[in-house]
């Protein structure tokens, strides 16, 4: 179902607080285009862990809507991002998802770029051709303590405030000393907002995530912040114990709701996301104390949520690919010197979240199918169980409302 001529502003104005969005926000190509234009093309997006680009010439590619981006480590050690489009006639330069190169060479006419984006060879372009004017177009990039974020906008929003807040939480995890143990990419046949809504609550966990529930707590007093923003005594005691051991833990939320950090406890006696609750990696990534510090939960809308544990870390990247399809990439990080088969078993490390991701995929797809019905109308969220969903939807609605000023009407 496409959006009707009613303005998006009017749909947002009549949105009931505590209810899901109207159907076009989950189904309409026009609303999807607005989401890309005003959110994904303007906000800082998580891309990859920096350890994925370990050597000069290591690169990865990323598609954000219509944009193609290549991220590469240069010979000076800096990681840079460029539009993955040759300045000659526009061909993709790097076609693979990741790789290792000496130079960035366009496969079409062999225009050749240095790893810092400078054009260094273009055959037979005439005596007046100035190669210095045809370097690759840069993309804004920030390295947040081992996590690479990019922004496609020529006028990127502030990143420093988030970085200053997050850095002390991340520093104890030593992500600069990480390596990628495994990466999983799945396509969920659901709108990107449904993927986020599902992530932001555990109302569904007990009936859908048997493996995750072996370690992730369902007790509302320790599983999250209360609907009014308060913290239970149990949770505050956990925060205080971690802080006393030198590990930042307190709940912090951005003023506009875009990002949040909090170090949440796992099930009693659980140390990591494994079937038995024991550590998945014997050589720990980071200096987190105490051993049962739980998981640092960090999200940054619209592209990432993360779990940083005492023994390993997981990053999740959310990327919309159509109005009803979303790519979810999960990366497991371990210490760079951890040896598979000695310090960790790959199946044991990954099985909980591989199962959980697939269960979430089915949930999101079933949710999307029901929303496609003409009978769908917005329904109420649970204040006690789905306050996180309400927080995400409020952030999304406010972000789109601000971006669309002056008022804009969606096409039929």
UniProtKB/Swiss-Prot annotation:
Amino-acid positions noted as binding Fe cation in the UniProt annotation, renumbered to this chain: 204, 209, 360
Annotated knockout phenotype: In strain Sm2011, the insertion mutant cannot grow on stachydrine but it can grow on N-methyl proline.
The note describing how and how many cofactors are bound reads: Binds 1 [2Fe-2S] cluster per subunit. Binds 1 Fe cation per subunit.
Q: List the catalytic activities from the record.
A: L-proline betaine + NADH + O2 + H(+) = N-methyl-L-proline + formaldehyde + NAD(+) + H2O; L-proline betaine + NADPH + O2 + H(+) = N-methyl-L-proline + formaldehyde + NADP(+) + H2O
Q: Where is the Rieske domain?
A: 45-150
Q: Identify the enzyme class.
A: oxidoreductase
- Which keywords accompany this UniProt record? 2Fe-2S, Iron, Iron-sulfur, Metal-binding, Monooxygenase, NAD, NADP, Oxidoreductase, Plasmid
Question: Which InterPro entries does this entry report, sorted A to Z?
Answer: Rieske_2Fe-2S, Rieske_2Fe-2S_sf, Ring-hydroxy_dOase_2Fe2S_BS, Ring_hydroxy_dOase_asu_C_dom, Rng_hydr_dOase-A
> What EC number(s) does the entry state?
1.14.13.247
Q: Which residues bind [2Fe-2S] cluster?
A: 86, 88, 106, 109
Per its UniProt record, what Gene3D superfamilies does this chain match? Answer: Naphthalene 1,2-dioxygenase Alpha Subunit, Chain A, domain 1, Rieske [2Fe-2S] iron-sulphur domain
GO-annotated molecular function: 2 iron, 2 sulfur cluster binding; dioxygenase activity; iron ion binding
Q: Where is the signal peptide?
A: none
Does the record carry Iron-sulfur as a key word? yes
- PROSITE patterns noted in UniProt: RIESKE (PS51296), RING_HYDROXYL_ALPHA (PS00570)
Q: Which cofactors does this protein require?
A: [2Fe-2S] cluster; Fe cation
Q: Which family does it belong to?
A: Belongs to the bacterial ring-hydroxylating dioxygenase alpha subunit family.
Matching PANTHER family, A to Z?
Answer: CHOLINE MONOOXYGENASE, CHLOROPLASTIC
Q: How does it assemble?
A: Homotrimer. The system is probably composed of an oxygenase subunit (Stc2) and two reductase subunits (Stc3 and Stc4).
What does the UniProt function comment say about this protein?
A: Monooxygenase involved in the catabolism of stachydrine (L-proline betaine), a source of carbon and nitrogen. Part of a Rieske-type oxygenase system that catalyzes the demethylation of stachydrine to produce N-methyl-L-proline (monomethylproline). Stc2 is the catalytic subunit.
Q: What is this protein called?
A: Stachydrine N-demethylase
Q: What species is given as this protein's source?
A: Rhizobium meliloti (strain 1021)
Give the organism's phylogenetic lineage: Bacteria, Pseudomonadati, Pseudomonadota, Alphaproteobacteria, Hyphomicrobiales
Q: Which gene encodes it?
A: stc2
């Amino acid at each position: 179902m496409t959006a009707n001529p009613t303005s998006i502003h009017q749909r947002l104005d009549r949105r009931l607080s505590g209810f899901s969005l109207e159907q076009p926000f989950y189904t309409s190509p026009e609303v999807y285009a607005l989401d890309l234009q005003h959110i994904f093309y303007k906000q800082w997006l998580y891309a990859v862990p920096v350890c994925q680009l370990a050597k000069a010439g290591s690169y990865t590619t990323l598609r954000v809507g219509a944009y193609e981006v290549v991220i590469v480590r240069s010979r000076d050690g800096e990681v840079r991002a460029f539009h993955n489009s040759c300045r000659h006639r526009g061909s993709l330069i790097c076609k693979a998802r990741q790789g290792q190169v000496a130079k960035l060479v366009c496969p079409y006419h062999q225009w050749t770029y240095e790893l810092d984006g400078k054009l260094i060879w273009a055959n037979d372009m005439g005596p007046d051709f100035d190669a210095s004017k045809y370097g690759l177009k840069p993309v804004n990039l920030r390295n947040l303590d081992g996590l690479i974020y990019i922004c496609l906008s020529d006028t990127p929003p502030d990143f420093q405030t988030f970085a200053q807040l997050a850095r002390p939480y991340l520093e104890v995890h030593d992500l600069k000393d990480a390596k990628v143990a495994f990466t999983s990419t799945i396509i969920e046949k659901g709108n990107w907002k449904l993927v986020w809504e599902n992530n932001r609550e555990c109302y569904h966990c007990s009936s859908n995530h048997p493996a995750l529930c072996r370690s992730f707590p369902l007790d509302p007093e320790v599983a999250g912040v209360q609907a009014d923003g308060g913290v239970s005594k149990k949770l505050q005691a956990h925060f205080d114990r971690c802080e006393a051991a030198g590990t930042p833990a307190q709940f912090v939320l951005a003023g506009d709701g875009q990002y949040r950090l909090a170090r949440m406890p796992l099930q009693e006696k659980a140390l990591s996301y494994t079937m038995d609750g024991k550590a998945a990696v014997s050589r720990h990534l980071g200096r987190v104390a105490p051993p049962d510090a739980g998981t640092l939960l960090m999200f940054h809308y619209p592209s990432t949520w993360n779990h940083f544990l005492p023994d390993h870390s997981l990053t999740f990247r959310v990327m919309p690919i159509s109005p009803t399809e979303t790519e979810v990439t999960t990366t497991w990080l371990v210490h760079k010197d951890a040896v598979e088969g000695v310090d960790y078993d790959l199946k044991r490390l990954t099985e909980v979240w591989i199962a959980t991701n697939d269960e979430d995929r089915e949930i999101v797809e079933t949710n999307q199918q029901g929303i496609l019905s003409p009978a769908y109308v917005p329904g109420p969220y649970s204040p006690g169980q789905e306050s996180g969903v309400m927080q995400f939807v409020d952030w999304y609605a406010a972000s789109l409302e601000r971006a669309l000023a002056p008022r804009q009407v969606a096409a039929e």
